[in-house]
Amino acid sequence: MIKNRMRIFGFIAGLLSIGTLFTACEPTEPDGNEGESSKELSKGFYVMTEGLWGQNNSTLDFYSIEDGQTHLDLFALTNGLGLGETANDMIEVGNKLFIVVNGSNCIMVADKKTCKKLAMIPINQGENPQPRCIAYHNGSVFVSC
């Protein structure tokens, strides 16, 4: 009896496995993100996602009010490298974005209009500083660790 159940279970599992080989995805139209790293961003806003802890998958996306599209992981697309591990806070100062990347112990500085990386400022005071929050006042940027 148990052997028959095992055979039936094995047969069903095999059919399901084979069935997945014959599934297909529909082809998608290009989303228009190709070459977007070279154009200047205008009306819209940035969305920073912290990602999963320890996964080095923080992103900086841009939502365009003009066309209603979200341009995912724009920082990586523009710069050829990811934002880092666990982005925590972001502030706009003039034409620059200052992004606190906690797990990578740094501040990423990017151009607000193009998302191009301008600088990476390492925070290496102490054993493991882990910067968290950022503020601007009277021409200075302050970071808490």
Region locations from a protein language model:
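A short beta-strand motif characteristic of beta-propeller blades
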Residues: 30, 69-82, 116-125
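Bacterial Sec-dependent N-terminal signal peptides
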Residues: 2-7, 14-45
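Mobile, glycine-rich extracellular loop/lid and propeptide segments
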Residues: 98, 105-111, 121, 130-136, ...
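Short loop/turn segments that connect beta-strands within the blades of beta-propeller domains
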Residues: 56, 93-94, 103-104, 137-138
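Structural motif
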Residues: 54-62, 106-109
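Conserved beta-strand positions in repeat-built beta-propeller and related beta-rich domains
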Residues: 45-55, 99-103, 143-145
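Short loop/turn segments that connect beta-strands within beta-propeller blades
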Residues: 65-67, 111-115
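Beta-rich, blade/repeat-based domains predominating
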Residues: 81-93, 125-139
